[in-house]
């Protein structure tokens, strides 16, 4: 055992220290502590950088000798129940630790510039550190109970960060929507965990898998309970990773600061669901029906997300739907058993999407002094255009991220997405066709965002009377440095997933676990097979890009009316269909409206009914008894006047009344 593993427990603990320090400082020395803004930011970055170094050490150990290491100690022990806590380091854990910490470091450096003049700068870094620590804690968790604890912490931190600017009504509504939607999935996750404990008597991943295999071999497995528990548990990743039909929270989560949007979409919250399914995939594979459910959930999500991204005019919201679509790819890969391809796409997508979101934040940050601080203007691509001339670093890095997400070789996402599409065609042609069609839509909507934002002429002064005479400018060094740093993995990390033995990479974690069995680089037939597989997906992506150039090239976009810049409607018989599709896409396929008219409306009616029942029936009964007692007491109080004659009169009157009542009853009886 390498001595480094003794310190693995520090990984989720180190980022917590800045949060604790900031919390104590704000509660104890609120005014004076605000003067330590730069110190707080630097400290948070330093602790996260230490966590990254520690993660790299474990990753290096896994490269040289891939094995699992568990450290457990009892937390709660009774006669019938034992709960252990600890940490687990294996290939999946090590690669996820490096991914999360590396993206978090760049996001924190970026946040130092982006949030510099925000009054909540210190509070933001406290939330950001706790958010990252929660994700790291989930990654190293060795059992389902510990997973659930950190799962809920991630949900709480996302609520705080999405609603960071809580004075905005839209931000307050968005954080509530994200929190409540994820509660649906979390409740299913909890029931699923309890179901697996009922089946196996354990929360440990390895023990659950071994006991389920034993029960299956001996025909003692309650398959109905297993399916129900698995589906309930799968609800958690459906909500957390924004899969259909619990995807509705993700676009609204863009109301938070852009750095947290990058972290949520790249390496933390939405990645948590994919990670959990990957961790439990050996268990899910016991049921082919469940794997089909996972695969079709991912395929529907991928296609729906791509369709909804086509007509978005908000830059961040367009990227949000692209995240939803790419998460669908990952879930599809897991559903068809393509564990390696799905995890590889999680890695490549994380760096590409972090680059794109931080680039969008740079754009928004430069647009705000020009068009105002209203998100409906500063994030609207209709007011942008020609920004590459004013923001060359942001423009070039955004283009690289766009090419990667479109799956254009040799950028990162090409290697992983192409493998998922090929696996999907091999297992079920329908799934392969959906994945292939989604690749074309991805090329279309991503270059639509790029062209309308960075190419052509700047449109804000022409179409917005309230805009200033300023022009956007390149962001500060602390904001452009992370873009440059993320550009390198976006270009080169895909080469680590080449399906060939490169000679200098012989490690098991890359050649076997991550990219599959190595094949001979010198064999020309292998190259031919590889290019045959990738030609169709790259071809449809290029077709989408060409169609995007046809509609949104600077020349064509400049000749349109303002209301048709981003969503042009052709003349002729197709106009009504195209307009209907744009409206369908802009209105999120009317899924939110459907939920409002069904679940939300009827839940509101039921809540009002129960509130009325509680106030007027249950509270009315209790309050009525109290009121009757009060009135009776008040009435009897006047009888206590201290006069014996009054007491004798009451006694005599009561005695006569009882006699009369007795005689009345006897007469009625006869």
UniProtKB/Swiss-Prot annotation:
GO terms for biological process: ATP synthesis coupled electron transport; electron transport coupled proton transport. InterPro entries: NADH_UbQ_OxRdtase_chlpt_su5_C, NADHpl_OxRdtase_5_subgr, ND/Mrp_TM, NU5C-like, Proton_antipo_N. Its EC number is 7.1.1.-. It is a multi-pass membrane protein. It catalyses: a plastoquinone + NADH + (n+1) H(+)(in) = a plastoquinol + NAD(+) + n H(+)(out); a plastoquinone + NADPH + (n+1) H(+)(in) = a plastoquinol + NADP(+) + n H(+)(out). GO terms for cellular component: chloroplast thylakoid membrane. GO terms for molecular function: NADH dehydrogenase (ubiquinone) activity; quinone binding. Its main location: plastid. It is an enzyme of class 7 (translocase). The chain crosses the membrane at residues 9-29, 39-59, 85-105, 120-140, 144-164, 188-208, 215-235, 258-278, 290-310, 327-347, 354-374, 395-415, 424-444, 479-499, 534-554, 648-668. It is found in: Plastid, Chloroplast thylakoid membrane. Keywords: Chloroplast, Membrane, NAD, NADP, Plastid, Plastoquinone, Quinone, Thylakoid, Translocase, Transmembrane, Transmembrane helix, Transport. NDH is composed of at least 16 different subunits, 5 of which are encoded in the nucleus. NDH shuttles electrons from NAD(P)H:plastoquinone, via FMN and iron-sulfur (Fe-S) centers, to quinones in the photosynthetic chain and possibly in a chloroplast respiratory chain. The immediate electron acceptor for the enzyme in this species is believed to be plastoquinone. Couples the redox reaction to proton translocation, and thus conserves the redox energy in a proton gradient. Belongs to the complex I subunit 5 family. This is NAD(P)H-quinone oxidoreductase subunit 5, chloroplastic. It comes from Chaetosphaeridium globosum (Charophycean green alga).
């Amino acid at each position: 055992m390498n001595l480094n593993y003794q310190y693995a427990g520090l990984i989720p603990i180190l980022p917590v220290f800045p949060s604790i320090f900031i919390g104590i400082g704000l509660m104890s020395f609120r005014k004076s502590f605000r003067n330590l803004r730069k110190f707080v930011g630097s400290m948070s970055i330093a602790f996260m950088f230490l966590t990254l170094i520690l993660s790299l050490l474990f990753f290096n150990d896994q490269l040289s000798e891939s094995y699992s290491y568990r450290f457990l100690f009892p937390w709660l022990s009774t006669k019938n129940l034992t709960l252990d806590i600890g940490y687990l380091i294996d290939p999946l854990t090590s690669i996820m630790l490096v991914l999360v910490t590396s993206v978090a470091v760049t996001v924190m450096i970026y946040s130092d510039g982006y949030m510099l003049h925000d009054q909540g700068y210190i509070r933001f870094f406290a939330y950001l550190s706790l958010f990252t620590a929660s994700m790291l804690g989930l990654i190293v968790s060795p059992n389902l109970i510990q997973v659930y604890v950190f799962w809920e912490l991630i949900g709480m931190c996302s609520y705080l960060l999405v609603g960071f600017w809580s004075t905005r009504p839209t931000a307050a509504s968005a954080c509530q929507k994200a929190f409540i939607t994820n509660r649906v999935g979390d409740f299913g996750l909890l029931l699923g965990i309890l179901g697996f404990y009922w089946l196996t008597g354990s929360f440990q991943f390895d023990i659950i898998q071994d006991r389920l295999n034993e029960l299956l071999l001996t025909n003692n497995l309650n398959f109905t309970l297993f399916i129900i528990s698995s589906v309930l548990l799968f609800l958690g990743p459906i909500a957390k990773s924004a899969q259909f039909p619990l995807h509705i929270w993700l676009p609204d989560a863009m109301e938070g600061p852009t750095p947290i949007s990058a972290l949520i979409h790249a390496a933390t919250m939405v990645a948590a669901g994919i990670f959990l399914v990957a961790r439990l995939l050996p268990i899910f594979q016991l049921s082919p029906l469940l794997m089909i459910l996972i695969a079709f959930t991912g395929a529907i999500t991928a296609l729906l997300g791509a369709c909804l991204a086509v007509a978005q005019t908000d830059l961040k919201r367009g990227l949000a739907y692209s995240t939803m679509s790419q998460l669908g790819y990952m879930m599809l890969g897991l559903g068809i058993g393509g564990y390696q391809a799905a995890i590889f796409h999680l890695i490549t997508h994380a760096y590409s999407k972090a680059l794109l979101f931080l680039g969008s934040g740079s754009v928004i940050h430069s647009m705000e002094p020009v068009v105002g601080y209203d998100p409906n203007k500063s994030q609207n691509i209709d007011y942008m255009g020609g920004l590459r001339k004013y923001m060359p670093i942001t423009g070039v890095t955004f283009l690289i991220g766009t090419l990667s997400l479109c799956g254009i070789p040799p950028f990162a996402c090409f290697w992983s997405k192409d493998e998922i599409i090929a696996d999907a065609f091999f297992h079920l042609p329908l799934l392969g066709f959906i994945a292939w069609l989604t690749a074309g839509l991805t090329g279309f909507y991503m270059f639509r965002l790029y062209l309308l934002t960075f190419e052509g002429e700047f449109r804000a002064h022409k179409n917005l009377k309230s805009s200033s005479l300023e022009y956007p400018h390149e962001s500060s060094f602390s904001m452009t440095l992370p873009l440059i740093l993320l550009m390198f993995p976006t270009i080169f990390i895909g080469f680590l997933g080449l399906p060939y033995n490169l000679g200098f990479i012989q490690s098991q974690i890359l050649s076997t676990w991550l990219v599959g069995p190595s094949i001979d680089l010198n064999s020309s037939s292998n190259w031919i097979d590889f290019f045959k597989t990738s030609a169709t997906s790259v071809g449809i992506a290029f077709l989408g890009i060409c169609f995007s150039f046809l509609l949104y090239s600077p020349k064509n976009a400049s000749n349109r009316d303002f209301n048709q810049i981003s969503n042009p409607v052709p003349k002729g018989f197709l106009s009504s269909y195209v307009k209907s599709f744009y409206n369908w896409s802009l209105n999120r396929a009317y899924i939110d409206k459907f939920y409002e008219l069904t679940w939300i409306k009827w839940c509101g009616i039921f809540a009002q009914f129960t509130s009325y029942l509680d106030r007027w029936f249950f509270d009315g009964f209790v309050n009525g008894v109290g009121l009757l007692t009060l009135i009776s007491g008040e009435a009897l109080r006047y009888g206590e006047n201290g006069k014996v004659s009054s007491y004798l009169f009451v006694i005599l009157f009561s005695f006569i009344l009882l006699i009369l009542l007795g005689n009345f009853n006897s007469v009625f009886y006869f």
